[in-house]
Amino acid sequence: MWYTSTRGMAPRVNFEGALFSGYAPDGGLYMPEELPRLDKETLRHWSTLSYRSLVKELCALFVGLELIPRHDLNGLIDQAFSRFRHRDVVHLCKLKNGLNILELWHGVTYAFKDLSLSCTAQFLQYFLEKKKKHVTIVVGTSGDTGSAAIESVQGSKNVDIIVLLPKGHCSKIQELQMTTVVKENVHVFGVEGNSDELDEPIKAVFADVAFVQRHNLMSLNSINWSRVLVQMAHHFFAYFQCTPSLDMHLLPTVEVVVPTGAGGNLAAGCIAQKMGLPISLVVAVNRNDIIHRTVQKGDFSLCEVVRKTLASAMDIQVPYNMERIFWLLAGSDSQTTRALMEQFERTQSLHLPKDLHSKLSEAVTSESVSDEAITQTMGRCWEENQYLLCPHSATAVSYHYQQTDSGQPSSIPRCCLAPASAVKFPEAVQAAGLTPETPAEILALEHKETRCTPMRRGDDWTQMLRDTIEALSLRWKGCVENTAE
């Protein structure tokens, strides 16, 4: 399996090359050159599998067994999911009035990113051990990615991780999950800015290809293909869990509602669709609605500011995985994708060509949800089911309630993806007039030592990041030389 840049100006790479990259050298994102097409018999067989086994089957298609033999691949995925709290890893909760919630948050940090990052970290370690290499991972987070990435690699001897978090823009628990990991290979920066602003120095560093190669830099944000690959399993599992039967001639459709920030889960769903999974996708966003405007009007343009909302992990204006979706729906047309993205980067405004907007509208529908609707949805779900939603999951369930209240019940099953547990967002739970449930391990974070380096407005964030990376490379080089002696 080969991977190509969405912008078409970088050499193709295998899975290992895509895994160890951030952006491609031409500024694009890696995508498979060809997507396998799944027939009905394969889908029927996969419908009998556990979530864990589904991930194994999907990864076997995209990793390349010459790189990771199947026996090793299975072992890595088993190890990745060994610390999840639910024996099934992912759990479907069936509530009243056709409300199906796929809980993706049973990992260590109570967020869906544990699923893809635990696997990605295992793949990294596999290649690093073989080659005796060191990498420095750079991650920008709006809340959940940072803690899941830290958790997946903390204590690793051949990985350093640098995380930039938006100070004051994520929940207190999210921040503590990052700043309380006081390990030699974990380096957390608190940025005086929002998640889009902290992405700028990261993108600037990755744009220096020689610097990236010299210091073995990589990203674990959802620009990393491995993240998107594992997230495809959410859609397959949601489909199989909500389909009454696959015995009919025409496979039934399931509607999957995807709360989205940077668009990794949405890109994964679009790829699953292209592979033959009969799902209808709905993207749910908060008031930072660039994806909603793109789907509805073809308007891929920045607003003046990122709006602070209760669904803070989705407070994003630049959903970079839309580039993957544009490329996919444009029929792998890298020339068109490159022209579109270069215009967006230049002007921060883009109107999709009519044919591309038409294809996007066919593949995806969308909904933008206010804070008021989020708290109302959280309250209603508790009242009807005694079930606590996180504010991000509530954006998906809000769409479900809109549809059921309209008096036109869906003729197809609907599954709402739940990306995080309500335990991470006590502030939002209280705003909904509900009582937070906080596990002992979360309460204990309050009393732990913290470590976080400030990145203040007026500081040169890019230079601070470069200096940190260079210092880590020097330290690793010193360790290797000492070991050799």
UniProtKB/Swiss-Prot annotation:
<comment type="function">
    <text>Acts as a catabolic phospho-lyase on both gamma- and beta-phosphorylated substrates. Degrades O-phospho-threonine (PThr) to alpha-ketobutyrate, ammonia and phosphate.</text>
</comment>
<dbReference type="InterPro" id="IPR029144">
    <property type="entry name" value="Thr_synth_N"/>
</dbReference>
<dbReference type="GO" id="GO:0030170">
    <property type="term" value="F:pyridoxal phosphate binding"/>
</dbReference>
<dbReference type="GO" id="GO:0070905">
    <property type="term" value="F:serine binding"/>
</dbReference>
<dbReference type="GO" id="GO:0016829">
    <property type="term" value="F:lyase activity"/>
</dbReference>
<dbReference type="InterPro" id="IPR037158">
    <property type="entry name" value="Thr_synth_N_sf"/>
</dbReference>
<dbReference type="InterPro" id="IPR036052">
    <property type="entry name" value="TrpB-like_PALP_sf"/>
</dbReference>
<dbReference type="GO" id="GO:0046360">
    <property type="term" value="P:2-oxobutyrate biosynthetic process"/>
</dbReference>
<dbReference type="InterPro" id="IPR004450">
    <property type="entry name" value="Thr_synthase-like"/>
</dbReference>
<keyword id="KW-0456">Lyase</keyword>
<dbReference type="Pfam" id="PF14821">
    <property type="entry name" value="Thr_synth_N"/>
</dbReference>
<dbReference type="GO" id="GO:0009071">
    <property type="term" value="P:serine family amino acid catabolic process"/>
</dbReference>
<feature type="modified residue" description="N6-(pyridoxal phosphate)lysine">
    <location>
        <position position="113"/>
    </location>
</feature>
<comment type="similarity">
    <text>Belongs to the threonine synthase family.</text>
</comment>
<dbReference type="InterPro" id="IPR001926">
    <property type="entry name" value="TrpB-like_PALP"/>
</dbReference>
<keyword id="KW-0663">Pyridoxal phosphate</keyword>
<dbReference type="Pfam" id="PF00291">
    <property type="entry name" value="PALP"/>
</dbReference>
<dbReference type="InterPro" id="IPR051166">
    <property type="entry name" value="Threonine_Synthase"/>
</dbReference>
<protein>
    <recommendedName>
        <fullName>Threonine synthase-like 2</fullName>
        <ecNumber>4.2.3.-</ecNumber>
    </recommendedName>
</protein>
